[in-house]
Amino acid sequence: MACCHHLERHSTTNPNTTTTALTLVPPPFSPTPSPPTSACGDCWAVSAVMTATDRWCIAHNQTTNPRLSVESMVSCCKVCGYGCADGFPNYAWHWLAGQKGTPYGIPTGGNQDDRRWCTKYTLPFCNHYDTVNDTGLPSCESGPPDKTPTCPSTCDNDTTYPTPWAQDNHQFSSAYAVPADETTIMTEIYTHGPVTAGFNVYSDWIHYPVGTGADQIYRPQGGTEMGGHAVRIVGWGESKGMKKKYWWIANSFGEKWGLGGFFKMAKGVGAAGIEESVVAGLV
């Protein structure tokens, strides 16, 4: 099953030429959709693991498309931070690449009702902030945060996945920081696929795209700072007419939030520090 199709108007231009990526990158790709969300503070793991899922698919020329396990990262990577109580995307990438004394690799894992992979995501789903609530899910902010689940050591009993746990270990060869430079980040995405990034969350971002104007590009407008958040930058573009540049970013609040789970962030102007903490890795 191929991971993807092209990114439509997002990330279609080589950052160093005027030639389109759709003619230069065989074959063009689109990012894995944002998974449903829970009340676990695991954005650090979701952003890193979904970036890794995309990069695995791209590196294998879309001949293999495993969904890597967010829950295994959250529950097993003790050096990454505090599980559901926050963590660090750069250490998640160290875990994937076996750097800094961490184990090496990650198994596959799907959503709660997905038996195609080794493990399932066991935490209950909920809706964050202004997510369109047409599913009957509770608000993630209405109750206590989820506790970090137990690190699995076998595949689920009801899985249809044929690969045993010991062999279901997807390993990356490297993990690294991407310099805080607009063109360098674009080149990294163009060459290898999406990247993981952190930024400062302000209260006006929570209600995205409310208040962003016709172009729907988020620019901090002086709201209250609420802490950090990790996301997956999957491409870039320019608004029609106004020619304002933006990053096209996958959030971790599910497909009912923002623009189908994605949002636009002003590019090249240091908006919310989005270009300052970018990390990635190679298969």
Spans of features found by a protein language model:
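Catalytic-core signature of thiol
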Residues: 1-283
